[in-house]
């Protein structure tokens, strides 16, 4: 049986002068359970390699991780901006350029929704405390597979077809979409107004702020 090849972007770790790249197993296992063939995509600044990576893919998941550097969306870092990696940011933006040219499906998860929004010229709250309104606890201390708050889903969205008008999700983020990128629409929000899912109006590009891969074995 031919399985669609699904690319998974990586995290970085530099410990004891031994740089590493890694990905949580939940992403790999979720793709396999869904019938795909997961491929881990290492971060590189080599354009030919990035283009070759894009050519082999039938789909792309832009995974979670550390914060997107605010320089990417033309802002200075504020006091609660977390760790970031320009190497990863620039790599993912170059990869997205090639993948979008192929018009293959893209799914962004957590940091992934933020990167997609920034790539398409949106902006982020560098910390949820800057929203200037009361917000839910979005950095849960529960196990990753357990839900912590409800989202409300738009009826004309991709999520509504599988989840209905509301769902319980997990939550592990301190940043969120501020200005939505052009040509995207909001698919879901939490009760405090934080954007929890988006989709492109013309292309197969979808993204969620929560971590479905961490819950997929349980629900």
Describe each model-derived feature in a short phrase.
Residues 113-115:
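Hydrophobic, aromatic-enriched interface-forming segments
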Residues 186:
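Condensing-enzyme catalytic core mediating Claisen C-C bond formation in acyl metabolism
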Residues 194-201:
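Short, surface-exposed beta-strand/loop micro-motifs that present aromatic residues
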Residues 1-107, 117-119, 125, 129-162, ...:
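N-terminal beta1-alpha1 cap of cysteine-dependent amidohydrolase-like domains
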Residues 183, 201-205:
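Beta-strand-turn-beta hairpins that frame and shape the catalytic cleft
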């Amino acid at each position: 049986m031919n399985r669609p090849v699904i690319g998974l972007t990586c995290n970085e770790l530099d410990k004891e002068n031994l740089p590493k790249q890694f990905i949580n197993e939940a992403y790999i296992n979720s793709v396999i359970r869904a019938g795909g063939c997961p491929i881990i995509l290492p971060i590189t600044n080599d354009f030919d390699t990035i283009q070759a990576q894009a050519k082999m893919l039938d789909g792309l998941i832009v995974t979670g991780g550390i914060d997107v550097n605010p320089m990417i969306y033309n802002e200075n870092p504020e006091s609660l901006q977390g760790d970031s990696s320009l190497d990863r940011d620039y790599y993912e933006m170059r990869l997205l350029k090639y993948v979008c040219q192929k018009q293959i499906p893209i799914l962004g998860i957590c940091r992934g929704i933020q990167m997609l929004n920034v790539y398409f010229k949106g902006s982020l709250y560098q910390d949820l405390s800057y929203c200037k309104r009361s917000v839910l606890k979005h950095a849960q201390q529960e196990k990753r597979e357990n839900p912590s708050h409800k989202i409300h889903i738009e009826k004309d969205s991709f999520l509504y077809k599988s989840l209905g008008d509301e769902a319980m999700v997990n939550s592990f983020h301190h940043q969120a979409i501020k200005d939505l990128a052009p040509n995207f629409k909001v698919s879901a929000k939490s009760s405090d107004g934080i954007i929890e899912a988006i989709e492109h109006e013309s292309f197969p590009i979808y993204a969620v702020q929560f971590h479905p891969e961490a819950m997929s074995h349980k629900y």
